[in-house]
Design a protein with these regions (language model features):
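Beta-strand->loop->alpha-helix junctions that form or flank phosphate-binding loops
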Residues: 18-42, 60-66, 90-95, 104, ...
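N-terminal leader/targeting and accessory segments in enzymes
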Residues: 7-8, 32-37, 64, 84, ...
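Short glycine-rich anion-binding loops that position phosphate/pyrophosphate groups of nucleotides
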Residues: 5-7, 126-127, 155-158, 184-185, ...
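C-terminal helical cap/extension that packs against the catalytic core
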Residues: 117, 167-224, 304-314, 574, ...
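Extended acidic/charged loop-beta regions that coordinate divalent cations
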Residues: 7-56, 95, 99-110, 390-430, ...
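Phosphate-binding loop of NTP-binding sites
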Residues: 2-4, 10-17, 52, 73, ...
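Nucleotide phosphate-binding/pyrophosphate-handling subdomain across enzymes
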Residues: 43, 53-177, 199, 264, ...
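Residue-level signal for inorganic ion chemistry
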Residues: 1, 36, 71, 75, ...
């Protein structure tokens, strides 16, 4: 069986001493025994008439490229001589898949729905000739689909540098759009390799050094009729950088991109995952999400994103390497496709409250459906990506909370969030175990300002000790300062403090307005000024700022006041604590008329000075006239000791609650770090209120 289109093949035919020679041709040679006629591209592959001595059959193949048609004719010749009939040959040829990594098309995980998606093809083309052939093979299909042809390509490091500009020129000349990215840079700088490629291109190309992001950007930015060629790596399942190989497969990233584009969403929790979602199998210090694939499948998950395939699970899996890093890359790529007015919120204290205030303002401005905000405190390297992945083209404004407890974390989060406005709310004594000094905290939170665009706006308190540092980090970008000084861009005066809130006049560059804030404490008024400054920075009218602040209500665990049946207040500030936030909360408690009790749990992550810090807040409670201090846990006991008479330390929650009940009626403030779980005290008090109410109602009915 010989190729009649090849000059050497024709010579073999003429010289062959075989009893029977079968010639095949894609050029329609009448002398050939097996021919491809009426060869043309379709939307999903090639169509041609397979002509043999037995007759003709129409063939649709997902293989692309004329060379693959020739390969099919060769196979047809072999099968024919083995005695297969034409209809059987046609069925088999139509079902053949490409060799891995050679013009191999990629499909999404099947979700049972029909979606119009671009065609994605992976090819190993890493030489000029191979790249030219691959693009040429796909051009006719792009034309048949009435779409564009996009090429994502790069060149390997430590290899022939002369071919780089040549390949760049081929891609620019033959494809409609090109994204230049990394291949296997090996020991070379990827940016230098990209520069070499760009030298052969007539115009400056689109560059995305992260290959995963380049693939996501290409697939998500394409029209359904488009064809995308991912060239260079083909079937490879790794990427080599500086001598280290990490798991990377173009086909897996393209599969995820297509599956996401079908409308799939992500979940990291098998307890809450829903049908059709993708389970991201994160690996932590205690649990490995890869061990929970069967649970995800039982909940109806469509597939799992894993670091490496778990063959024991039947759940479809997409292998993206380190899943935590994959989540960050996915979120960064998704964020780059959306352009809402985005505000990032950092700081030691008040982040979540200020974020909720801003969210209330944004809702007043553009409505619920057009605004996005961080849910709860999902502010780490899992929560921030999940929040960004909720972005849609309908969102006009967003506020994202960025949290940290180690150096370098804000850099990671700000890099994917890419805000237009960034707030540093304050710098206080938090995470001292890892950051050691308040200045280190100020620098870490302030690092968000470096990720603002040149047109971005930095927002921070003008009277903070580190205001000059934040101005320096802002570089030449515009700055908005807030606080109680009349020289600041956003400030307040005519302040009237009430037990459950504050009223004041707020001054902004837009003008002045009366504001009623339904949250107690001067620190919450500061948060409101920060929110107003951020909102002004993204263009929110003053009337919407006022409406949004008026509509704000404290969230559970964050200075959330609620009335007790005895007429006193329970202030739930149990979400978190550091020395400065405890002092601010004590100030609020001290302003209330009547007996007051502080219930304090341990303050976590405050470093070697923990004992002194707890003693400090205990002494401050005494100084401010708080009537009693009850503490829970060994660390918090230092606060009770410093408080003196009226300070009681407990290690048992039930004993503390009984003592608290015995000392009521009184205003009660409950505060502590997450690790102290002081919300248990709040729940116990609420349960007690409910029990007392039921008893009263029962006595009334008996009477």
């Amino acid at each position: 069986v010989i190729n009649a289109d090849d000059e050497a093949g024709m010579a073999f035919c003429a010289q062959s001493k075989a009893e029977h020679v079968v010639a095949y041709s894609t050029a329609g040679s009448r002398a050939a025994d097996i021919r491809a006629q009426d060869l043309h591209a379709g939307p999903y592959g090639l169509v041609f008439a397979l002509c043999t001595r037995q007759g003709t059959v129409q063939l649709l193949t997902r293989l692309v490229g004329e060379h693959n048609v020739a390969n099919l004719l060769l196979v047809a010749g072999v099968l024919q001589e083995l005695g297969w009939d034409l209809s059987r040959i046609g069925r088999v040829l139509a079902g053949l898949a490409p060799v891995e990594g050679r013009l191999q098309w990629v499909e999404p995980i099947d979700n049972g729905q029909v979606s119009a998606l671009p065609m994605v093809v992976v090819d190993y083309a890493h030489t000029p000739d191979a790249l030219e052939r691959a693009i040429a093979a796909l051009r006719s299909i792009a034309s048949a689909r009435s779409g564009r042809l996009l090429c994502v390509m790069g060149c390997g490091g430590n290899r022939d540098k002369a071919k780089r500009p040549v390949m760049g020129g081929i891609a620019a000349r033959l494809a409609d759009d090109v994204i230049v990215t990394s291949d296997n840079p090996r020991d070379e700088d990827p940016a230098v390799i990209v520069q070499d490629i760009a030298h052969g291109m007539a115009i400056e190309p689109v560059v995305e050094l992260d290959r995963a992001k380049a693939i996501l950007r290409a697939v998500w930015g394409a029209q359904p009729a488009d064809v995308i060629l991912l060239a260079g790596k083909g079937h490879e399942t790794y990427q080599e950088v500086k001598g280290a190989r990490t798991r990377f497969d173009d086909r897996q990233w393209a599969c995820f991109a297509l599956t996401w584009r079908q409308g799939a969403t992500l979940s990291t929790d098998t307890r809450r995952i829903g049908p059709g979602q993708l389970f991201v199998a994160l690996k932590g210090p205690v649990f490995d999400g890869g061990d929970y694939l069967d649970q995800a499948a039982a909940q109806g998950a469509l597939a799992a994103i894993v670091d490496a395939r778990r063959p024991q699970s039947d759940l479809p899996q997409i292998e993206l390497g380190d899943t935590r890093q994959a989540l960050l890359r996915i979120a960064a790529a998704w964020r780059s496709l959306h352009a809402p007015a985005l505000i990032a919120v950092t700081g030691s204290n008040g982040k979540t409250t200020t974020k909720e205030m801003i969210a209330s303002i944004l809702r007043a401005w553009v409505g619920d459906d057009a605004s996005l905000s961080t849910q709860g405190n999902l502010n780490n390297d899992i929560g921030v990506p999940l929040t960004l992945l909720r972005l849609t083209r309908g969102h006009r404004a967003a506020v994202i909370e960025l949290g940290m407890n180690h150096p370098g974390e804000i850099d990671v989060l700000a890099d994917i969030a890419r805000p237009q406005v960034a707030l540093v709310n304050n710098a206080q004594r938090e995470h001292q175990e890892f950051l050691h000094t308040v200045e280190a905290v100020a620098r870490e939170n302030g690092s968000v300002l470096r990720y603002l665009p040149a047109s971005g706006i930095a927002v921070f308190p003008g009277d903070d000790t580190y205001a000059s540092l934040w101005r320096e980090l802002a570089g030449g970008r515009a700055v908005l300062r807030f606080g109680f000084d009349a020289t600041f861009d956003v400030h307040a005066d005519q302040i009237h403090v009430e037990p459950t809130g504050t009223s004041c006049q707020v001054h902004t560059p837009q003008g002045t307005a009366a504001v009623v804030l339904h949250a107690p404490g001067a620190h919450n008024l500061r948060n409101a000024l920060a929110a107003a400054a951020c909102a002004h920075a993204v263009g929110v009218p003053l009337s919407c700022i006022v409406k949004g602040l008026d509509g704000f209500r404290p969230v559970s665990g964050r200075m959330h006041p609620r009335a007790l049946d005895d007429g006193f207040q329970l202030i739930d500030d149990s979400y978190n604590a550091n020395p400065d936030s405890v002092r601010a909360a004590i100030d609020v408690l001290a302003q209330l008329q009547g007996k007051s009790i502080l219930v304090l749990g341990a303050m976590g992550e405050i470093g070697a000075d923990s004992q002194a810090a707890h003693a400090e807040v205990g002494a401050y409670a005494r100084e401010r006239g708080v009537d009693a201090l009850l503490t829970l846990g060994s660390e918090a006991a230092h606060a009770a000791q410093a408080y003196g008479d009226g300070g009681l330390a407990f290690t048992d929650l039930d004993e503390l609650v009984r003592e608290l009940e015995a000392r009521r009626p009184a205003h009660v403030l409950v505060k502590g770090s997450r690790s102290a779980r002081m919300e248990r005290v709040v729940r116990a008090l609420e349960a007690s209120q409910h029990t007392d109410k039921n008893q009263e109602e029962g006595n009334h009915h008996v009477a």
